[in-house]
């Protein structure tokens, strides 16, 4: 039987084949996934050509299904916890259940993200070989052996270093767009917080509050942050940051990896994502220091100094956040550049566009 999109409606059949690839945390090597898929297909008795697009389509459907199930459970437990707290009832059991389901949800998101990356990589390769149960394939015809070859001349070849002579990477990683350790230490000193852990928590709480609001100089930074029995005015923290030689956005960018995982684990996007024009599929990217997510120059998520995101941002999230930042710039400049509208649709390509690119991180 040849499996095509026409008979893929037998969802139970495909569920049995594809679901293990969605839920298993083993074997993240993208080079092995199709081989294992072929083996599973063979176990189900199909030895003829398999349309890979069927696998991709069903996988996407199942990933969405799992996400909705976990999201609903988290939402229900959150509501139950709120009701219990309001009623003054014991809520420790609910908290533990919420923590457990949130961790499982985060793990599922991570597995799904890994699988999506693997499958996307495989799709880009073109799948010149058909997916069959036996793993056999037709030979790919190469171009003529007599085709002219391009010879590349590199003027920097004199500086070539063999791989086995590469120096060990010990220098600090940094970028001007993200606050470094010296910047953070200056802010800590200005705030007179001697305990680094307390300062880290204070900084993270501040970044969380900015994620749902803004890191702009125009923001009033009203509100109070309480850590370890001590209160800090948000405007005082913002002042300490600016007087330390960095912007609030650069400071918050240092916490971008933590903030990203924090929101995904709780399934809670920045509060004002709708107001900023983000969609349901891009709402987690609705904060203005999003550009630092995944950067090794930001605070790591792991104790060994590595960065491990629950899932990486999608292309749609990257594009939506980039569009938001450009829209903010156009709106700001249209007030002084003589434009009758701030819409990027009408103003894009104006003479001041390239100049404004440098201002993306200054807003």
From Swiss-Prot:
A GO cellular component annotation in the UniProt record: helical viral capsid
Pfam family, one: Flexi_CP
Cross-referenced InterPro entries: Pltvir_coat
Positions of the UniProt region annotated as Disordered: 122-144
Keyword Coiled coil listed: yes
Source organism of the structure: Citrus leaf blotch virus (isolate Nagami kumquat/France/SRA-153/1984) (CLBV)
One function term, GO molecular function aspect: structural molecule activity
Coiled-coil region list: 72-111
Compartment list: Virion
Domain of life: Viruses
Protein name: Capsid protein
Keywords assigned by UniProt, alphabetized: Capsid protein, Coiled coil, Helical capsid protein, Virion
